[in-house]
Amino acid sequence: PCVMGHENAGWIEDVGSDVEGFKKGDSVILHPIISGTNGTCLSCRKGLDTHAENGSMPGLNIKEGGYSELLKTSVRNLIKIPNTLTPKDVAPFSDAGLTAYRVAKKATRHLLPGENCVIIGAGGLGHIAIQCLKAMCAANIIIVEKSETALKHAMPLGGDHGVLIDGNEVERVKELTKGLGAEAVIDMVGEKGSTSMGLNMTKNTGSYYIVGYGEDIKIKSVDMIISERNIIGNLIGTWSELYELMELANKDLVRLSMQEYKLSEANKALHDLNNGKVKGRAVLIP
């Protein structure tokens, strides 16, 4: 048996005798990766704690997750939540938001004002990435989505153009980018043909960032060489990137779209999620 829940935030109930800087009652968000070496491995020393040796996550390879009243964690994973926010406001930032922020941060390093960034999928991660991109760069944001409802919801968050997936989406993106494709394409879906679609939307010398997963990425080596496109994988962000994301949230530059459920309604939340009834992220409140 396992208690699920790896996106966690809450109030400190108790601290160990050696803990400094945190006390009972502090509101905190938890970075989801717990280092198996207490932060002494080379990856952690380099600030790449996402790739910590023997790393583990609550609710996955640690059996005690966040679908509970209490959760034990390491002080290394804690970040204090700004006073303008509450744990329920930010809990999904600890993975979904952090992943979206990380890929947006990667993309904005190379996006110049007036260039183009496509986001495929405007759901739980996509709607956060749109806001991060808008806050961090002046590129044109093109949202590609199969759901007309989701597209309408996402556009006010920072979209410059919206493209509905109807079989002509690649051609539409090409029209919006003067026939060249986008300098950056962020694929939040990673299945049902989105990888091929995303690569076809990517400009020569551009970058295709894959976040969602489910299918193989198929491209001939000669096409990679001739186009000089980059394919970049994306995992959860680091502790420092979660801190940066909290700063964006504190400035009200990134907000979560969420539905609240009581902890006792966890099964209903999972049922609604499975049936596509959740807009944004579902949050359990003890």
Residue ranges of predicted features:
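Glycine-rich cofactor phosphate-binding loops and adjacent beta1-alpha1 units
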Residues: 108-113, 136, 151-230
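C-terminal hydrophobic helical "lid"/dimerization subdomain
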Residues: 143, 148, 196-200, 239-286
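Residue-level marker of beta-strand positions
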Residues: 7-9, 27, 43, 70, ...
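Glycine-rich beta-strand-centered segment in the early N-terminal region that forms part
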Residues: 1-42, 82-85
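Rossmann-fold dehydrogenase core element
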Residues: 207-209, 219-259
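Mid-domain Rossmann-like dinucleotide-binding core that forms the NAD(H)/NADP(H) cofactor-binding site
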Residues: 76-78, 83-167, 171-172
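Cysteine-cluster motifs in flexible loop/terminal segments that predominantly coordinate metals
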Residues: 21, 32-79, 83
